[in-house]
Amino acid sequence: MNKSDALVVFSGGQDSTTCLFWAKKHFRKVYALSFIYGQKHVKEVELARVIAGKAGVEFKAMDVSFIGNLGKNSLTDTTITMDEVKPADSFPNTFVPGRNLFFLSIAAVYARELGINHIVTGVSQTDFSGYPDCRDAFIKSLNVTLNLAMDEQFVLHTPLMWIDKAETWALADELGVLDLIRHETLTCYNGVQGDGCGHCPACKLRREGLEKYLEIKAEREKR
């Protein structure tokens, strides 16, 4: 395994783009892997391809559309209206069951073919929106499972695991890509690039984080 290269699970959204540039800072060569999983807004994959090109990163998209057929959710089913608020007794219907499990398992197989043991993902327990497959315990458990399954020494990196959205924007600024991430990524559940629709849960979380970070930055610059 090549310990100086890394594979980034890359959607073209705020978090994974931040992780892409974080990986470029920490590893010699970086590869980006995107997934077509039946999402309504598949244009995110094309935007991911463009961003990867600007970053000088080798890009690959894999079709795993079966994931979208396994369970009902509002990201893949056009007949389901998206939850704007997380239900008190269940996951929000933007949760795609098994998505990160499949993504990271497939990424590990692909990384093995590339001779890579470092895999980077943008999951965060701080801003995990109630998704169980964004938790640190899940990542650590899967890391062990993948190593046992393939007799390898994979390392799953989660640079955003313990930081909130404001701190994620701060990291993007530190990496010199705040403007790129603000204007060129697609985080919006309604498929609107950049600042997004402003109404869906992803846009609200992203906007609140940006506003908080810009306030902190402005206060710091006054000192």
From Swiss-Prot:
Binds 1 zinc ion per subunit. It holds the Pfam family QueC. Pathway: Purine metabolism; 7-cyano-7-deazaguanine biosynthesis. The keyword Zinc applies. It catalyses: 7-carboxy-7-deazaguanine + NH4(+) + ATP = 7-cyano-7-deazaguanine + ADP + phosphate + H2O + H(+). The keyword Cell division does not apply. Belongs to the QueC family. Catalyzes the ATP-dependent conversion of 7-carboxy-7-deazaguanine (CDG) to 7-cyano-7-deazaguanine (preQ(0)). This is 7-cyano-7-deazaguanine synthase. The lineage of its organism: Bacteria, Pseudomonadati, Bacteroidota, Bacteroidia, Bacteroidales.
